[in-house]
């Protein structure tokens, strides 16, 4: 009876209440749960980028092959890993693998991507995974250190980064006296001041400070030619100002990436050519770097008989008197002649590199009137006075002749009256 009563109750509640039959659970082994840890882990280190990629990249349980993974536009390969390893590891320098860099107001941003590009295995022509690209980015504060080491993080890869991201453009131009515009005519009177402006166009780079490392004047665009006259030497000493010239760097700068200076014009003795070319070696450093003996702009001030820098500690110019600045302890011209010379640039031509040798010219000298008078030529003023004197003498002579002829004609035409005496 009890058994029949129980079966009757189950029949009434048969709609699936589970009162009589416990619910059954089935485990879906086809779609496992997603992994709890991320499949791509990026470490932005001081000068390195480390990327760890899970072989279960898509979380489906189907493992990717390390050979199908590359980093960056240059397709850098991962480190060698064993078959039992769960991850694939990349370790590259920040400026390698075609990584791009961008400078913002507060950060230096390196960007790249992880590429999964599956290829058929063996003789098969099918793929079981899709192509995928994962963007990767590392941000470094510009005004703080990213590690415990006392090294500026943005400067370690600076040179390579600069060349790969956007090259610098250097220029050297002749300017008007007010520095407001470029000089339209290259002509000068001897003794005039030539206003020169060196500049670098930095684009989106770290703020830079430009220096004129060396300048030389020659009769041709070849700065190794003879004769020559050194204007700037010893890594930024304007040595032309030591003579009777007033050549000097302009302080303060208008901008860190611009450096202006004046040079008293001159010509080479015992040479009939009235023109010169000026070639300068330009270079840059980070604007945050304090100027030193190798990176400076020093002028000699005759009133105090001392060297003064445009910026930085005053003692960085002391080496200008010794003629030995930096480790080499020799003239930049002499050390530069020891290696092949770079290609020359014509006037206003811009170079694209981290340093550049720029030539401006020719500067043509017309000379002064007083100089020509000393050399024995007749000045225009003297010629005019002589001409006026000759004209006056000629005019007086002609007037005398005309008056004489007129008087003679008048005398010939007058009737003669002779006195008659009466005889008685």
From Swiss-Prot:
Residues that span the membrane, as ranges: 384-404
Post-translational events: Proteolytically cleaved before the transmembrane segment to yield the secreted ectodomain incorporated in the zona pellucida.
Protein's GO biological process: binding of sperm to zona pellucida; blastocyst formation; egg coat formation; humoral immune response mediated by circulating immunoglobulin; negative regulation of binding of sperm to zona pellucida; negative regulation of DNA-templated transcription; oocyte development; positive regulation of acrosomal vesicle exocytosis
Disulfide bridge map: 44-138, 76-97, 215-280, 237-298
Coiled coil: none
Keyword Transmembrane attributed: yes
Residues making up the signal peptide according to the UniProt record: 1-22
Function: Component of the zona pellucida, an extracellular matrix surrounding oocytes which mediates sperm binding, induction of the acrosome reaction and prevents post-fertilization polyspermy. The zona pellucida is composed of 3 to 4 glycoproteins, ZP1, ZP2, ZP3, and ZP4. ZP3 is essential for sperm binding and zona matrix formation.
Record-level GO cellular component terms: collagen-containing extracellular matrix; egg coat; extracellular matrix; extracellular space; plasma membrane
ZP domain: residues covered: 43-305
Keyword Transmembrane helix attached: yes
Propeptide stretches in the record: 349-424
Stated family: Belongs to the ZP domain family. ZPC subfamily.
Superkingdom of source: Eukaryota
Single annotated GO MF: structural constituent of egg coat
Membrane topology: Single-pass type I membrane protein
Residue ranges that the UniProt entry lists as topological domain Cytoplasmic: 405-424
Organism: Felis catus (Cat)
Tissue: Expressed in oocytes.
Keywords assigned by UniProt, alphabetized: Cell membrane, Cleavage on pair of basic residues, Disulfide bond, Extracellular matrix, Fertilization, Glycoprotein, Membrane, Receptor, Secreted, Signal, Transmembrane, Transmembrane helix
Gene name in the database record: ZP3
Protein name from the UniProt record: Zona pellucida sperm-binding protein 3
Extracellular side: 23-383
Domain notes: The ZP domain is involved in the polymerization of the ZP proteins to form the zona pellucida.
Compartments, record wording: Cell membrane
InterPro entries (UniProt xref): ZP-C, ZP-C_dom, ZP-N, ZP_chr, ZP_dom, ZP_dom_CS
């Amino acid at each position: 009876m009890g058994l029949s009563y129980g079966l009757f109750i189950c029949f009434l509640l048969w709609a699936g209440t589970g009162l009589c039959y416990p619910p059954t659970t089935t485990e879906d082994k086809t779609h496992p749960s997603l992994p709890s840890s991320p499949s791509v882990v990026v470490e932005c280190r001081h000068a390195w980028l480390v990327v760890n990629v899970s072989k279960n990249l898509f979380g489906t349980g189907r493992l990717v092959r390390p050979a199908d993974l590359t980093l960056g536009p240059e397709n850098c390969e991962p480190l060698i890993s064993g078959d039992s390893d769960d991850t694939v590891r990349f370790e590259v320098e920040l400026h390698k693998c075609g990584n791009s860099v961008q400078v913002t107001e507060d950060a230096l941003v390196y960007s790249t991507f992880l590429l999964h590009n599956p290829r058929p295995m063996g003789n098969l022509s099918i793929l079981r995974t899709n192509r995928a690209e994962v963007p990767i980015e590392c941000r470094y504060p510009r005004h703080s250190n990213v590690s415990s080491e006392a090294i500026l993080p943005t400067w370690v890869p600076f040179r390579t980064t600069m060349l790969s991201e956007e090259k610098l453009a250097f220029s050297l131009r002749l300017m008007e006296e007010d520095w407001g515009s470029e000089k339209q005519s290259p002509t000068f009177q001897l003794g005039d001041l030539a206003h020169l402006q060196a500049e670098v166009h930095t684009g989106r780079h770290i703020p830079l400070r430009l220096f004129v490392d060396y300048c030389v004047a020659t009769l041709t665009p070849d700065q190794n030619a003879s004769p020559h006259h050194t204007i700037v030497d010893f890594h930024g000493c304007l040595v032309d100002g030591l003579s009777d010239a007033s050549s000097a760097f302009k302080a303060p700068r208008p901008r860190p990436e611009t450096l202006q200076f004046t040079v008293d014009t001159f010509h080479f003795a015992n040479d009939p050519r009235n023109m010169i070319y000026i070639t300068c070696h330009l270079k840059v450093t980070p604007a945050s770097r304090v100027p030193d003996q190798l990176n400076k702009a020093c002028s000699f001030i005759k009133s105090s008989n001392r060297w003064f820098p445009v910026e930085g500690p005053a003692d960085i110019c002391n080496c200008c008197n010794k003629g030995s600045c930096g480790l080499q302890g020799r003239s930049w011209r002499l050390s530069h002649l020891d290696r092949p010379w770079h290609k020359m640039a014509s006037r206003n031509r811009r170079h694209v590199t981290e340093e550049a040798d720029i030539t401006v010219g020719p500067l043509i000298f017309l000379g002064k009137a007083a100089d020509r008078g000393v050399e024995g030529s007749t000045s225009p003023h003297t010629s005019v006075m002589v001409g006026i004197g000759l004209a006056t003498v000629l005019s007086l002579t002609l007037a005398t002749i005309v008056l004489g002829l007129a008087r003679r004609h008048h005398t010939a035409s007058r009737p003669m009256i002779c006195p008659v005496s009466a005889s008685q």
